[in-house]
Amino acid sequence: MKKVAIFASGTGSNFEKIADDERLKDKISIELLVCDKKNAAVIKKAHDRNIKVFIFSAKDFESKEAYESVIFEKVKDLDYIFLAGYMRIISPYFLEKYKKTILNLHPSLLPKFKGKDAIEQAFNAGEKEIGISIHYVNEELDGGEVIAQRSFEVAGNDTIETVTEKVHKLEHKLYPEVILKLVEEALLKEH
């Protein structure tokens, strides 16, 4: 059993899919949700599942390093961190301290459309194929090694709303699958 933290900032739909995935139940224990928005819907989803929550507001700290130091103390003994709609950039300071695996889910086919509003950027650019990437987190924004990608062809009648919905469906399916594979491989190596 691997102990993990999930970092999220919004509704928590990916958090929910990971937490409720039956294949992961005996492989991971979600020890903590880290959230930077006190009114985020993901908080209730964590509470409903009896998962501890750490909520912080960046403005309550003198620096990014200050709040990341507090977060590090809470996650330092955990095996993995999974970013699921976490809207803050993990700093080199944190990456230097936390030497274990951090995964991120990004709603574009990296290396295209890094950063915020990736779905909208891809749609407005007239991309014929849109998708998602799951990658290791490193010091470069959305620049770590890509582990998995999935995509779909944009239909002529697609809108930004329908494309966003299709992206979320891909996320909800692929992220738990990638986590399962990663954890199963790690557990096999231990035996």
What are these regions (language model features)?
Residues 21, 28, 87-190:
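Donor/substrate-binding cores of folate-linked one-carbon enzymes
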